[in-house]
């Protein structure tokens, strides 16, 4: 049986990448939250 997590850089970029976050209002809200919180990294890649 195949494992559930089959990592792919392209899929990851397209779902949690910076430009994807910037494309929607909620994504921008998320980035601003992380900025306010002082995160070292805004997106997990």
Curated annotation (Swiss-Prot):
Ribonucleoprotein is among the record's keywords: yes
Keyword Ribonucleoprotein attributed: yes
A matching Pfam family: Ribosomal_L34
GO molecular function: structural constituent of ribosome
Region feature Disordered, mapped onto this chain: 1-45
Gene3D superfamilies with a match to the protein in the record: 1.10.287.3980
GO CC, one annotated term: ribosome
UniProt keyword annotations, A-Z: Ribonucleoprotein, Ribosomal protein
GO terms classed as biological process: translation
Source organism superkingdom: Bacteria
Skewed-composition ranges (Basic residues): 1-14, 26-45
PROSITE patterns linked to this entry: RIBOSOMAL_L34 (PS00784)
NCBIfam families, A to Z: rpmH_bact
Similarity remark: Belongs to the bacterial ribosomal protein bL34 family.
Entry protein name: Large ribosomal subunit protein bL34
Native species: Chlamydia pneumoniae (Chlamydophila pneumoniae)
Taxonomic lineage: Bacteria, Pseudomonadati, Chlamydiota, Chlamydiia, Chlamydiales
Name of the gene this protein is made from: rpmH
């Amino acid at each position: 049986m195949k494992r559930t997590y089959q990592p792919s850089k392209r899929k990851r970029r397209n779902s949690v990448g910076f430009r994807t976050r910037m494309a929607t209002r909620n994504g921008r809200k998320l980035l601003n939250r992380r900025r306010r919180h002082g995160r070292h990294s805004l997106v997990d890649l």
